[in-house]
């Protein structure tokens, strides 16, 4: 596992030049591969995905930017979390990750193919620890949940469906 792996998706340290690992050549290769999937579908028309006939995209393509909403990546939408009544302040932002670390800590290129019409977005719900509204006894805890995203395997020239951790909420916990 890579020691640079951050707590949550979209927190990858840009300072290490990691963004440069996804070169224009790699981006072009991914675009072409995604275009090929779209062409296979033979489907035209709006309202449903061009990619749903492909098993990996069907299983894993739920975070298309055009349909994903902030609440899709909130913890309380996933078992075993329940919606905590007291939550410390959260900053919410969306991102389009081009790479990340899987739950197993493995570095992956995440599929982004804007030209082919497939972009993946994840909303981060990160604790703003500076303003801790949990009272005197509680503490703000960063919750994480798992999202499944389409990745691209450069060695095998193929798509995979893989799990990543994303920051999803900040319940107050008593210790």
Curated annotation (Swiss-Prot):
Compartments reported by the entry: Secreted
Top-rank lineage group of the source organism: Eukaryota
InterPro entries, per the entry: Coagulin (IPR000275), Cystine-knot_cytokine (IPR029034)
GO biological process, one term: hemolymph coagulation
Principal subcellular localization: secreted
GO cellular component, one term: extracellular region
Disulfides per UniProt: 8-167, 10-95, 60-161, 65-121, 75-168, 88-140, 127-170, 134-172
Its job: Coagulogen is a gel-forming protein of hemolymph; it hinders the spread of invaders by immobilizing them.
UniProt-recorded name of the protein: Coagulogen
């Amino acid at each position: 596992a890579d020691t640079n792996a951050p707590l949550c998706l979209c927190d990858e340290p840009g300072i290490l030049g990691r963004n440069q690992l996804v070169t224009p050549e790699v981006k072009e290769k991914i675009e072409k591969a995604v275009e090929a999937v779209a062409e296979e579908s033979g489907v035209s028309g709006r309202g449903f995905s061009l990619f749903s006939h492909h098993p990996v995209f069907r299983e894993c393509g739920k975070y298309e930017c055009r349909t994903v909403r902030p609440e899709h990546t909130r913890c309380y939408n996933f078992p075993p979390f329940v919606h905590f009544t007291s939550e410390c302040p959260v900053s919410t932002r969306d991102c389009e990750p081009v790479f990340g670390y899987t739950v197993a800590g493995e570095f992956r290129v995440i599929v982004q193919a804007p030209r082919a019409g497939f972009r993946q977005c994840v909303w981060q719900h990160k604790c703003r620890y500076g303003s801790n509204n949990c009272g005197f006894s509680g503490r703000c805890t960063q919750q994480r949940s798992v999202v499944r995203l389409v990745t691209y395997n450069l060695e095998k020239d193929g798509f995979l469906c893989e799990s990543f951790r994303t920051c999803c909420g900040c319940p107050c916990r008593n210790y």
